[in-house]
Amino acid sequence: MAAAAAWTGAASPNSLLLSRSPPHAAALAPSPGSSMRRRLLLGVGTPAVAALAAAAPPAVLQDGAVTVLITAGAYSLVRVFDELTERRLIEKSLSRKVVHVLSGVLFMSSWPLFSNSTEARYFAAVVPFLNSMRLLIYGLRLYTDEALVKSVTREGKPEELLRGPLYYVLVLLFSVLVFWRESPIGIVSLSMMSGGDGFADIVGRRYGSAKLPFNRKKSWAGSISMFISGFLLSAMMMLYFSSLGYIDVIWEEALGKLALVALAATVVECVPVTEVVDDNISVPLATMLVAFLLFSSNRTIVN
């Protein structure tokens, strides 16, 4: 809790982003934000919302079921691209980066499926936690899974699972536990890591003949793609969560700040320190820092 509190700013009447979290004491009861989200999704009036709320399962059952569903979906996603790669329907490098992009985007998109209980984030955290355990087991060669290794590593070596892929799921885990769905910091950080960094590699491999003068491993096309895709995905995910009532966004202010965050993440991704610090660590950490500086002073928790 102390870690989460450190990222919250002072209350302001003109706050850029307002959390819609329910009170802890009434976490299991339908909140105004929850009712609003149901109205948005159903397109119906209050009576239907009340009926749906009355018929809703207990939070622990809802969160448990969603956790199982998302865990199965994450496993299936990797298996599908394993199969596509094995059949030579998609290049290995492209398969790896598509999984990189979709894993973060789909995981974030699933957060509204969880209840409004205070324990919901811990259920969501089970998904990246299980994936991290899986990567550790196969990365340490305690068991073997050639399909997994081929689909998410560059050179097909099991020990690679302990670097980029493991860092990736650990950032997912950290973002869920510390920020969750009411904070723009976690949303933007995961958007830049999954979408921005992912598309930078995809575009850079195909159109990256013009290299950066200070880093010959990076290209202008890849860096520009990272800025644009990271910015757009961040904005879309912010729109997604704001439309469901988790955050309020003043877009005239938010878009400029998102552009600054995307620029900072792009600069960090361009720096030639890949051999020392993996992009899956440097990009989200830089994004979190800049997003915290830009957004935290305008963010308040509404109880």
Swiss-Prot record:
Main enzyme class: transferase
Any one GO cellular component localisation term in the record: chloroplast membrane
EC number: 2.7.1.182
Organism superkingdom: Eukaryota
Bilayer topology annotation: Multi-pass membrane protein
Annotated localization: Plastid, Chloroplast membrane
Gene Ontology MF annotations: phytol kinase activity
Transmembrane segments: 98-118, 122-144, 168-188, 227-247, 254-274, 276-296
Pathway assigned in UniProt: Cofactor biosynthesis; tocopherol biosynthesis
Chief site of localization: plastid
GO BP term, example: vitamin E biosynthetic process
Transit peptide per record: 1-49
Entry keyword set: Chloroplast, Kinase, Membrane, Plastid, Transferase, Transit peptide, Transmembrane, Transmembrane helix
Reaction equation(s) it catalyzes: phytol + CTP = phytyl phosphate + CDP + H(+)
InterPro entries the UniProt entry points to: Phytol/farnesol_kinase
Family, similarity comment: Belongs to the polyprenol kinase family.
Function: Involved in the activation and reutilization of phytol from chlorophyll degradation in plant metabolism, including tocopherol biosynthesis. Catalyzes the conversion of phytol to phytol monophosphate (PMP).
Name the UniProt record assigns to this protein: Probable phytol kinase, chloroplastic
Organism, scientific name: Zea mays
